[in-house]
């Protein structure tokens, strides 16, 4: 029982995300996008299993398969990153690649983009593009690139989209 309790505690502890790294990534994003940063409180970063993130995000029914590498929880100003890369991703650079993507969402939120989009999925377009640019510019593994078809589909609103504007 103690082993499981310790795992539970460790699984939800904030990671000591290097503030310098986060600020450097934010600088990269602001130089390569319309988003601005004016010393707002940085989000905390925590590690979770993909399974737990899927349960958190899909309260009713978790899709099978469920492939989530991370997400930004704007209400609590928190970023969650998977404890290990998805099958299609490379170990090396995984954390940075997900962190830059979620920091784009952080900047979208503080810049009011959540209120401007037709649905939350529209927010993914910039996040995927900036993430892929970062991967290229910092010579991270090409295996970290987003699949173009997936990125396009994940960025499109449809008539069944119940996320609405307001971000996530």
Model-inferred region functions:
Residues 1-7:
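Sec-dependent signal peptide recognition
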Residues 58-92:
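Active-site scaffold of zinc-dependent metalloenzymes
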Residues 118-152:
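Post-HExxH zinc-binding segment in Zn-dependent metallohydrolases
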Residues 151-168:
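Short, low-complexity, Pro/Ser/Thr/Gly-rich segments in the mature regions of secreted, periplasmic
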């Amino acid at each position: 029982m103690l082993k499981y309790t310790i795992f539970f505690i460790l699984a939800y502890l904030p990671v000591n995300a290097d503030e310098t790294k986060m600020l450097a990534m934010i600088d990269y994003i602001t130089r390569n996008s319309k988003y601005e940063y004016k010393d707002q409180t940085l989000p905390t970063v925590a590690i979770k299993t993909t399974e737990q993130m899927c349960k958190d995000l899909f309260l009713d029914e978790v899709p099978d398969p469920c492939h989530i590498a991370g997400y930004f929880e704007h209400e609590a100003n928190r970023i969650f990153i998977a404890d290990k890369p998805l099958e299609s991703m490379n170990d090396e650079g995984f954390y940075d690649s997900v962190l830059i993507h979620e920091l784009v969402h952080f900047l979208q939120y503080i810049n009011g983009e959540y209120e401007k989009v037709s649905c939350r999925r529209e927010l993914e377009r910039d996040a995927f593009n900036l993430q892929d640019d970062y991967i290229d510019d910092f010579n991270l593994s090409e295996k970290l690139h987003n699949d173009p078809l997936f990125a396009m589909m994940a960025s499109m609103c449809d008539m069944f989209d119940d996320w609405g504007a307001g971000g996530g």
